[in-house]
Amino acid sequence: MNPTFFVVLHSAALACAHTIFQRVYVDGVGEGHLSGIRIPESNWPIMDLSSNDIICNGGVNPYHEPVSLAIIQVPAGSTITAEWHPTIDDVNTTESIRPDHKGPVIAYLAKVPDALQTDVAGLSWFKFYEDGLSDDGSWATDRLIANAGKVNFTIPSCIQPGAYLLRHEIIAVHKAQTYPGAQFYMECAQLNITGPGSVVPSPTATFPGAYGSTDPGITVDIERLINYTVPGMPAEG
């Protein structure tokens, strides 16, 4: 085989294995492709838990320009559908992530002064959704694949209204026997949450820092797994 062709083929296969969060639906109504999300050009994972890139991506994976200035209007208590695909060309509408990339799917929110602010360091994130390994041996990523790259979760109905960032994440742990091995795919969407709520959720955590390299959900051999602990704090809905 021609070496150049092999490299191109190998790179294409790796790219198809990876994934990007690229569309939001609010109660079933689509917000538009790439709208309201900070989208990287590359679908490569973040693997360094100490890097600020673990917050909203970017950095080593520069954002697709122009970065969306849309703010997604979300009533508290509504259902969000997040859609994942390997590329951002809006052509692939069924593939999401390669089936061997097993792992959890997670969602966090952080209240911010401005949903368009570029400084995301030091934000207080609370987890409100997680899906990991089910009793039947299927993973959250299996369910994502079966649903053509879509996952649904409910925005808490009681939280304070205002500007938020939604940090949506897939952690692929198929090669996580040692650190760095787990692959972190995340993007942040810009939300304005409306409603009469007044609750300030807790506990919260900051990124970097929410995950440790020796956490049981980060360094794990899924071939010898009996049960799985989703990384981070418990999800509070």
Swiss-Prot record:
The protein's enzyme class: oxidoreductase
Presence of keyword Disulfide bond: yes
Disulfide bonds: 56-188
GO BP field: cellulose catabolic process
Binding site for Cu(2+): 18, 101, 185
Superkingdom, natural source: Eukaryota
CDD domains: LPMO_AA9 (cd21175)
Cofactor(s) for this UniProt protein: Cu(2+)
Residues that hold O2 according to the record: 174, 183
Reactions mediated catalytically: [(1->4)-beta-D-glucosyl]n+m + reduced acceptor + O2 = 4-dehydro-beta-D-glucosyl-[(1->4)-beta-D-glucosyl]n-1 + [(1->4)-beta-D-glucosyl]m + acceptor + H2O
Main location: secreted
Positions annotated as glycosylated: 92, 152, 192, 227
Keywords recorded for this protein, A-Z: Carbohydrate metabolism, Cellulose degradation, Copper, Disulfide bond, Glycoprotein, Metal-binding, Monooxygenase, Oxidoreductase, Polysaccharide degradation, Secreted, Signal
GO cellular component: extracellular region
Gene3D superfamilies: 2.70.50.70
Use in biotech settings: Lignocellulose is the most abundant polymeric composite on Earth and is a recalcitrant but promising renewable substrate for industrial biotechnology applications. Together with cellobiose dehydrogenases (CDHs) an enzymatic system capable of oxidative cellulose cleavage is formed, which increases the efficiency of cellulases and put LPMOs at focus of biofuel research.
Signal peptide, first to last residue: 1-17
InterPro entries recorded: AA9 (IPR049892), AA9_LPMO (IPR005103)
EC number: 1.14.99.56
Entry's cofactor comment: Binds 1 copper ion per subunit.
Role this protein plays: Lytic polysaccharide monooxygenase (LPMO) that depolymerizes crystalline and amorphous polysaccharides via the oxidation of scissile alpha- or beta-(1-4)-glycosidic bonds, yielding C1 or C4 oxidation products. Catalysis by LPMOs requires the reduction of the active-site copper from Cu(II) to Cu(I) by a reducing agent and H(2)O(2) or O(2) as a cosubstrate.
Family classification: Belongs to the polysaccharide monooxygenase AA9 family.
Protein name, UniProt field: AA9 family lytic polysaccharide monooxygenase C
Source organism of the structure: Gloeophyllum trabeum (strain ATCC 11539 / FP-39264 / Madison 617) (Brown rot fungus)
